[in-house]
Design a protein with these regions (language model features):
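Cleavable N-terminal export/targeting peptides
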Residues: 1-34, 273
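Transmembrane beta-barrel domains of bacterial outer-membrane proteins
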Residues: 30-273
């Protein structure tokens, strides 16, 4: 796929926004987890924070199963008890190809998570229960593909000059799985944001994940995936739109083919303030 083809796809993101909204409405809503906070709160509060996202991303890869990547979901801080917070995450991710029609949903990820944290100085430490299940869309039904992780996560937000940095890192053990050979996971996420004007800012993000593989399940080694992206943030009264480009390597891109894929990407993301 050529660069001009990727640009044409990105130009059609307005049309895709409707598709994302329709697909997301079919499931209980990635924020992949609670976002890092600058400091603990001063008093207990209920429903203190909600991080929402709606995104559509065009993929440049020579595979008709992977043309678009969409997300609809969010993270909610249910209770802030000063020494930490209790949070939940719900996310629906739909992969769209072009095998049978221009926007052809063919698989989906459902992510659910619950966590509780405590502050240790300027660092937040959380215990996490994380569930992922993968499903085919508009395709014959197959066996379940899913895994549950019990792990820990550290979060930190700080500023350098006029740039705000958010850091998250975590690791966990697979407690239960179906049709995957993962035994443990580890991940990190780093995002840097800088305001240029009251309305416009720039940002860059890098994230990665490791999947330990059960030696008894086959001859695969530890799997690695990652994503980098950078773009602009345009602030509105109640929300922010991010326009970005980047590159991704995804482990087991198809749920029944244990092969990684790589692609360039460009897209949009709507988030709340």
């Amino acid at each position: 796929m050529t660069d001009s083809s990727l640009i044409r796809r990105a130009a059609r993101c307005a049309r895709l926004m409707l598709v994302v909204a329709v697909c997301g409405a079919r499931a209980s809503a990635q924020q992949p987890g609670p976002q890092p906070l600058a400091a603990p709160s001063s008093s207990p509060e209920f429903l203190t924070r909600y991080d929402f996202q709606l995104s559509g991303t065009a993929l440049a890869v020579d595979d008709k199963r992977f043309s678009w990547d969409t997300h609809f979901g969010g993270a909610l801080d249910v209770v802030d008890y000063v020494r930490g917070r209790a949070s939940i995450v719900a996310d629906y991710q739909a992969m769209l190809g072009s095998e049978f029609r221009p926007f052809d949903p063919n698989q989906a990820y459902y992510t659910l998570e619950a966590s509780g944290s405590v502050w240790a100085g300027a660092i937040e430490i959380a215990g996490v229960f994380h569930h992922v299940s993968r499903h085919l869309s508009d395709r014959p039904k197959r066996p379940a593909v899913a895994w549950n992780v019990l792990g820990a996560r550290v979060l930190r937000q700080f500023s350098i000059g006029g740039t705000t940095l958010g850091v998250r890192a975590g690791a966990g053990r697979i407690l239960q799985h179906a049709l995957v050979d993962y035994s443990w996971t580890a991940d990190f996420d780093l995002v840097a944001r800088r305001s240029l004007t009251e309305r416009v800012g720039v940002y860059a993000r890098g994230s990665g994940e490791l999947f330990g593989v059960d030696p008894a399940s086959g001859d695969r080694e530890m799997q690695r995936d990652g994503r980098i992206e950078a773009g602009v943030r345009i602030n509105g009264r109640a929300g922010v739109v991010e326009l970005f480009a980047g590159y991704e390597r995804r482990v087991d891109a198809d749920p029944f083919e244990r092969l990684p894929l790589q692609w360039a990407l460009a897209g949009f993301r709507l988030v709340n303030k």
